[in-house]
């Protein structure tokens, strides 16, 4: 199975590719980086993940890229790690919330649903860029 994550300072959005369908999973709430990396490691083990797709912004965001790379090094994972450009994935995910009212959009932003929808976009890009080549 393939899992994608959108690493943020407060939450880590999670999405999985299951039988050709991309599904958002419950986001990991990040209290500190060690707890969050442990939670992600546990999830990768529980779901028997072979490929972890990680969203990263373009090179002009050097600090963010360094933070994401450092976090991923803390994750206990022996499978393949693929970095995919995440530019605008959060904006695209937010546009997917058009059907929600303003209050529910705010709640989706706070509880991690938006982050997991962003992880879905990252996983879609992985499927388009990497899996199509095979």
Swiss-Prot record:
UniProt cross-references to Pfam families, sorted A to Z: RuvX (PF03652)
EC id: 3.1.-.-
InterPro entries per record: RNaseH-like_sf, YqgF, YqgF/RNaseH-like_dom, YqgF/RNaseH-like_dom_sf
UniProt-annotated location(s): Cytoplasm
Enzyme class, UniProt record, top EC level: hydrolase
UniProt keywords, alphabetically: Cytoplasm, Hydrolase, Nuclease, Ribosome biogenesis
Cellular component terms per the entry's GO annotation: cytosol
Molecular function GO labels: nuclease activity
Biological processes annotated in GO: rRNA 5'-end processing
Highest taxon listed in the record's lineage: Bacteria
Keyword Nuclease in annotation: yes
Major site of localization recorded for this protein: cytoplasm
UniProt function note: Could be a nuclease involved in processing of the 5'-end of pre-16S rRNA.
Record-stated family: Belongs to the YqgF nuclease family.
Name of the protein in its database record: Putative pre-16S rRNA nuclease
Species of the source: Helicobacter pylori (strain G27)
Lineage start: Bacteria, Pseudomonadati, Campylobacterota, Epsilonproteobacteria, Campylobacterales
